[in-house]
Regions:
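Alpha-helical segment of the N-proximal tetratricopeptide repeat
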Residues: 42-75, 92
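Canonical positions in the second alpha-helix
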Residues: 71-72, 105-106, 139-140
């Protein structure tokens, strides 16, 4: 990238960061979340098995922890916490399609969780799915106005895709 483009990119970043207070006055889009239809007994079981899975993970008993997470998903198929943890296991096992699917479901079921969204955006970038990464990062910039990482990642992707008009707008 030549010096002129670098200067324009720096000016654009500075402008967007300095306008961060304007973004906070925008209304947040309404996100329809599936209400948990678990009975108190089912919720208690889910919590128990999830915490037990985390305990086993900490003890490095990964196979047992993964089995308990699968049981958690049998109890509550849309539980974002279990979906996220399962996605991490799939990624470790290099089963990226299954990991990506689980992570996408986790983000869909917990859209206000910054870390789930950040993980999915990073995965999209690693998989060279830049359009999906841009779409998610654009949503994150609106949803998490106090976080600057999504904004910088978005500007980087715009630069790589040579979408200079998007950087300025």
């Amino acid at each position: 990238m030549n010096k002129k483009n670098s200067i324009w990119l720096l000016v654009a970043v500075w402008t967007l960061v300095s306008c961060g207070t304007v973004k906070s006055t925008r209304e947040k889009p309404a996100v329809a979340l599936a209400q948990s239809s678990l009975t108190p007994e089912q919720q208690r079981k889910y919590d128990y098995f999830f915490l037990e899975a985390m305990r086993l993970k900490e003890k490095k008993d990964y196979a047992s922890a993964f089995g308990l997470l699968q049981h958690c998903l049998d109890i509550h198929p849309n539980a974002a916490s279990a979906l996220y943890e399962v996605s991490q296991y799939y990624m470790f096992l290099r089963q990226v399609p299954q990991g990506q699917e689980a992570l996408e479901k986790a983000v869909a079921n917990a859209p206000d969780n910054y870390w789930y969204s950040q993980g999915l955006a990073s995965l999209y970038q690693q998989q060279n799915e830049l359009d999906k990464a841009v779409t998610l990062l654009e949503q994150m910039v609106v949803r998490f106005p106090a976080k600057q990482d999504p904004l910088f990642n978005l500007l980087d992707l715009y630069g790589r895709q040579e979408k200079y008009d998007e950087v300025i707008s």
